[in-house]
């Protein structure tokens, strides 16, 4: 069993919007033999859309708004990629995805450097000590000086870096990269489809001068000497602890520098790591199966109103049609058609191992954070739901479609796209999100997937926080005094809806024994 687990590599690709994350995902799939032509992600002239952006709205907007899961084999390794939304409005989906991966590749735009979304996502990686590899993309366009970029990465992401490839110029002068890990030169040949052959040259021979010209060769030798003098030797142990990030340079769109990244990645990235539960730590090579649901997606197939629960296997082996224990429901379940994914293509899977992501058909059985085991009561930790930052009343715009609207809202909330609160004062439904774009996505999906129409009504709120107290009388007094501000979430928990920072601070001062939480573990 250990060899199956050892060959698993489960990771997420994260980035600020437009850094080239989806392009990189596609090129990795190209190398894995999963697609013949990459999706020419942005170009509308070529009417292809990125393989990993598979919801209609993603294809229209040219951005990823949900996490895609894809798996393929490469050089005896089993690769599971989670391509996450870069758009900040969908950060919560990304945060949850980071609980299901063993390592991360961060894509940084060579011209723009570190951007806000990258910083936030890196904080989540740091909290979990997730190993990180950095790919500096778009070197075939004008980019910042590589030394400046490395300084910025260290300062902004608070991590030691070590370049494993080094760029020779950028923009129209971009000649390629020198691979410090293998001591070879790879010359740049733009190619969107075919995987290019490497031109390999030893740096200390005249052949280098012949390939890129004597002035550039001299400059490259000087820069590489400086790199070795300034940056520590690459240390795999430090990388695995999340303390050092290897850096690669390239152009995902032109298929350049991606193979070096992939080859080094499968060699150094961790196989499945232990997972914490409230009861104990689960080791991946334990014989018994355990797993948790980190994501739910409605309508992978709009013809069948189906939901799929994405389950990360934490230990042991999963087998089709075997009874497993659903901890929250306290009952056993069998799964006759578990699936694995290549973006929209699903295949039924008979067995899967620790590190794999499987899709389980879901008709309302699962919530994010649910645990499956062979009988042990375990609760996996750390799948948070954050306090929303934007709020609107949701209203039915078509009285004939009340049932469809209710079902649509229910399934979309199960996905964790947004949060639903019922105002205790007037009984109205409030949707809370992290950003404006989510309201558009909800409205679009209700209309296109559920044939239901909604309207948004304005409501002025500052924060939603979950409240609890060890003193039931004080909690009751608080709820009476703040009646117009109280709501319930879908779990029936008490939520305080403050309309200003002042109201929140006064409530915290007046009620010392009430705990105000800004994240709820699902």
Name what the model sees in each region:
Residues 1-522:
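Structural and coupling elements of P-loop NTPases
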